Design a protein with these regions (language model features):
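Generic hydrophobic secondary-structure packing signal
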Residues: 3, 19-22, 65
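Short acidic, gly/pro-rich beta-turn/loop elements at beta-sheet edges
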Residues: 17-19, 60-62, 96-98
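An amphipathic, aromatic/His-enriched active-site/gating alpha helix that lines ligand/cofactor pockets
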Residues: 28-37, 53-87
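Short, glycine- and small/hydrophobic-rich beta-strand elements in well-ordered beta-sheets
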Residues: 21-49
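Non-catalytic surface loops within mature trypsin-like serine protease
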Residues: 11-13, 56, 90-92
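Glycine-rich beta-strand-turn "strand-cap" elements at beta-sheet edges
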Residues: 2, 40-46, 72-104
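Short, well-ordered beta-strand segments in beta-rich or mixed alpha/beta enzyme
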Residues: 4-10, 40-64
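Short, surface-exposed ligand-recognition loops at beta-strand->loop->(often short) alpha-helix junctions
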Residues: 10-20
């Protein structure tokens, strides 16, 4: 069963561009990781949100120690106003299945 992750990073106001650059550098490499079904970056002011979908928990575990994720969290740490907020989520089946969950 696919695993969905939402990771939120809050940049220091003066570090918004640095956080964006560090995050976008990781994306191409993460997209090539086994089991990556979705790895999408979104932003609003100083908040950056990754919406992720992995084929299974093993793929997510591999990603969490892969070079791209390791470098991202190492390089971004000094630019954040707070610790990253990472949530692993389970879909709630409701409504039209085609519209009520991420696609695998």
């Amino acid at each position: 069963m696919p695993v969905v992750v939402v990771a939120t990073l809050t940049a220091k106001p003066e570090s918004r561009d640095a956080v964006r650059d560090i995050c976008t550098r990781a994306i191409e490499q993460v997209h090539s990781e086994p089991g990556c079904q979705l790895y999408s970056l979104h932003e609003s002011a100083d908040t950056f949100v990754f919406v992720e979908q992995w084929s299974d928990t093993d793929a997510l575990k591999t990603h969490s120690t892969a070079p791209a994720a390791t470098a991202l969290f190492r390089d971004v740490a000094e630019h954040l106003a707070a610790a990253p907020d990472v949530k692993v989520l389970t879909p709630v089946g409701a409504g039209d299945p085609a519209k009520g969950r991420l696609r695998s």
